[in-house]
A protein has these predicted regions:
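N-terminal cap/lid segment of alpha/beta-hydrolase-fold proteins
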Residues: 2-43
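The serine-hydrolase catalytic nucleophile loop
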Residues: 54-67, 80, 250-252
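Active-site glycine-rich loops that stabilize anionic/oxyanionic intermediates
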Residues: 45, 50-56
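Alpha/beta-hydrolase active-site loop
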Residues: 96-136
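Conserved alpha/beta-hydrolase
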Residues: 65-90, 94-105
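Catalytic histidine-centered segment of alpha/beta-hydrolase-like enzymes
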Residues: 276-287
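Primarily recognizes the serine-hydrolase "nucleophile elbow" in alpha/beta-hydrolase
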Residues: 123-193, 209, 220
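Serine-hydrolase catalytic core
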Residues: 205-276
Length: 301
């Protein structure tokens, strides 16, 4: 969730792992993706889909994916649509209402980039699971989901609603819904979009202060990760930063943990890594966060 993507420590590819650049197709949009697999792939091995956060890319996840592959899994990272190497969205903007449009008039097509639409991110994550499910060597009964920051909420929402996902690991995850003035603004955007009095192409998408890209607020009103937790039943581990500066961890994974641990039979774990901030999870917190995720998938996939 950054204005610019931090420069992360470089990936040192293990000798036992190979990486292949692939394309995932999601609603006709090409998603830039990388597949990590052990060089000696067993006949049937677990697979993990990884989701980056706001302003990130597939490279945010590369060290985690390589580590999963080194542990014997097949891992898939991808960049969300409209960001970096993935394809744009095409938005059509007509000059007239449909009923009044001249027969010879074609609507204008606009390429849209760097937009956060949570439901589009969910669809792209599902497409990534579809892709991984068809990868030779992947055991379809042992697919895991991993997500970081805003992508952690996407992974959690997906795990609650996709029966193919059997284990979940998230870190510094943003999972709370919009509230207060932001929710009121999003509701108004949805109303105005439906009534044709607001056009994000002509009027501009909203910007979240301090964050890269743009926000399609009209699409946020029904995005509720915590509201999905009654359907989440897979083993779930959540990691937070002790000095998180972007949001209150008590309102996000802290709240998710309280909900999950109250569910009979739910396997869940919550850990706060001390002395790191949000982006510290990729630096001083990397050794701990990555090992917890690897161990979780080993135990539950």
């Amino acid at each position: 969730m950054a204005l610019t993507e931090p420069v992360y420590p470089p990936l040192i590819m293990p000798d036992s792992v190979e990486r292949e650049r692939v394309t995932i197709w999601s609603k006709g949009v090409a998603l830039d993706a990388d597949l990590y697999r052990p060089r000696a792939v067993p006949t049937s091995t677990p697979g993990v889909v990884l989701c980056h956060g706001w302003g990130g890319s597939k490279l945010t996840c590369e060290r985690y994916a390589a580590l999963f592959a080194e542990a014997g899994m097949i891992a898939l990272t991808f960049t969300q649509a409209t960001w970096f190497g993935s394809g744009p969205h095409l938005r059509m903007r007509a000059q007239h209402p449909v009923s009044d449009a001249p027969a010879d008039e074609s609507p204008e097509a606009h390429r849209v980039r760097d937009v956060v639409d949570p439901f589009d991110w969910l669809h792209n994550f599902r497409a990534a699971v579809d892709y991984l499910e068809g990868e030779p060597g992947v055991d379809r009964e042992r697919i895991g989901a991993w997500g970081t920051s805003f992508g952690g909420g996407v992974a959690m929402h997906s795990a609650a609603n996709d029966r193919r996902i059997r284990a979940l690991s998230v870190q510094v995850a943003y999972v709370a819904s919009l509230a207060g003035p932001q929710l009121a603004h999003a509701n108004q955007r949805a109303i105005d979009s439906a009534r044709g009095t607001y056009d994000p192409i002509a009027d501009g998408f909203d910007v979240m202060p301090g964050l890269a890209g743009f926000t399609d607020f009209a699409r946020w009103t029904q995005y509720d990760v915590l509201g999905q937790l009654d359907r989440l039943s897979v083993p779930t581990v959540m990691l937070d930063a002790g000095k998180e500066e972007l949001f209150s961890i008590a309102d996000h994974c802290g709240r998710a943990y309280e909900i999950l641990k109250a569910k009979p039979g739910q396997i869940t774990r919550y850990e706060v890594i001390p002395d790191i901030d949000h982006y510290g999870i990729y630096f001083d917190g990397y050794a701990r966060s990555s090992q917890v995720a690897v161990d979780w998938f080993r135990d539950h996939l």
